[in-house]
Amino acid sequence: GTLSVLGADAARAGSRPDAAVRDATQQYATTGKAPVIERSDSVVYPFGESQPVLQCTPLRACDVELEAGEVVHGVALGDTERWISSPLYSGDPDALVPHVVVKPRDYGITTNMIVTTTRRTYHLNLVAPAKGKTDETDGAYLRRLRFYYPGDVVEQWSDAAQLEATRANRQSEATIASLTGAMNPGRMNFDYSL
């Protein structure tokens, strides 16, 4: 089923399947629209569906977590004078999770960031709110931004469904072929009486 494919991806990534991501991916498969998932510790964006906005404040590090197994090729900041970025990795050596840590040097600034990896290119907007808008409870500080990949998962579901249809078709053809061989008139015995 569809959940087992997503579960296999999550296992490969070294994490448990996430019910909110499963539900959001199901919604994407049905409607073509993938929602942003908001949590207390992070915001999870559907890759390729919108341009994420990461709000960071000076003296705080913000984490952009990418898909396990990706390797960061490069990080480009629009404003390298007032923003700092550092690629990092976490997790098991066989399924490293790439992160890009971002810090603004000042208040009231914005820029963009492009991250290229072995699998995709990420485009993000970075915002450091004006001074005085830095209380973590007002939403001005986002510790962690993550992604889920509904297009990839739906494609895997489609591939799995096609594979299952091909298997069923081959099984049906094999059954017909075995019956056809049994019904070969040249191999039938007509020398009998009642």
Label for each model-derived stretch:
Residues G1-L194:
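A general "mature secreted/periplasmic domain" signal
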